[in-house]
């Protein structure tokens, strides 16, 4: 199987995961619950206003599916990059031009992520250090307005992001979109101390 076909197959698998994630998110929303909201009352009894069993299972499955999605995304990026190497000047599934970073030095970081937001579903985690955000990197970053502009221009589109997490690079695909919370991402991105802001 060639790289394009493999990437397409992986994308289909990820779409299926996204569908399951949405179903599980609906279970939590229906029960007015989040990933860490209480399931017991003050006396230690299960709340009778929610389906405790369903919420517990939804939380567990969401954690598993998020991990599976992150692993799939990394495989997809690898297949796309391999295809790009074979087909000069052609991009697999993205209109983004290749970005050549001058360094792997982070320039902004994630200070908080709202549960079940586009940022959360896309794989952002608190304290992720961003070394590439679309075509932005440490070498061409000037101010936070650039991050906001890329986010706004990429509504309902994929932004390729590379972060440093636990001292290793992690590639993500973030899709800014309108959701039940504020903004298009549901996370707080702040400049790193010493960055050119």
Swiss-Prot record:
Keywords: Chaperone
Family that this chain belongs to: Belongs to the proteasome subunit p27 family.
Name of this protein: Probable 26S proteasome non-ATPase regulatory subunit 9
Functional description taken from the UniProt entry: Acts as a chaperone during the assembly of the 26S proteasome, specifically of the base subcomplex of the 19S regulatory complex (RC).
Cellular component aspect of the GO annotation: cytoplasm; nucleus
Pfam families from the UniProt entry: Nas2_N (PF18265), PDZ_6 (PF17820)
Domain PDZ span(s) in chain numbering: 75-166
Encoding gene per record: psmd-9
Ranges in coiled-coil conformation: none
InterPro entries (alphabetical): Nas2_N (IPR040815), PDZ_6 (IPR041489), PDZ_sf (IPR036034), PSMD9 (IPR035269)
Keyword Chaperone appears in the UniProt entry: yes
GO biological-process terms attached to the record: proteasome regulatory particle assembly
């Amino acid at each position: 199987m060639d790289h394009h076909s493999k990437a397409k197959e992986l994308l289909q698998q990820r779409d299926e995961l996204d569908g399951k994630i949405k179903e599980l998110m609906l279970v939590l929303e229906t029960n007015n619950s989040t990933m860490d909201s209480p399931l017991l009352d003050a006396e230690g009894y299960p709340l009778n206003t929610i389906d405790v069993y369903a919420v517990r299972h939804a939380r567990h499955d969401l954690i598993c599916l998020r991990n599976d999605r992150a692993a799939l995304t990394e495989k997809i990026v690898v297949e796309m990059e391999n295809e790009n190497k074979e087909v000069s000047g052609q991009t697999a599934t993205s209109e983004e031009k290749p970005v050549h970073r001058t360094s792997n030095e982070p320039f902004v970081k994630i200070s908080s992520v709202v549960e079940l937001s586009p940022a959360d579903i896309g794989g952002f985690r608190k304290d992720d250090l961003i070394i590439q955000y679309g075509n932005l990197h440490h070498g061409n970053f000037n101010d936070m307005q650039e991050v906001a502009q890329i986010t706004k221009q990429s509504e309902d589109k994929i932004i390729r992001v590379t972060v440093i997490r636990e001292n290793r690079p992690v590639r993500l695909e973030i899709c800014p979109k309108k959701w039940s919370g504020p903004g298009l991402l549901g996370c707080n991105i702040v400049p790193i101390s010493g960055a050119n802001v």
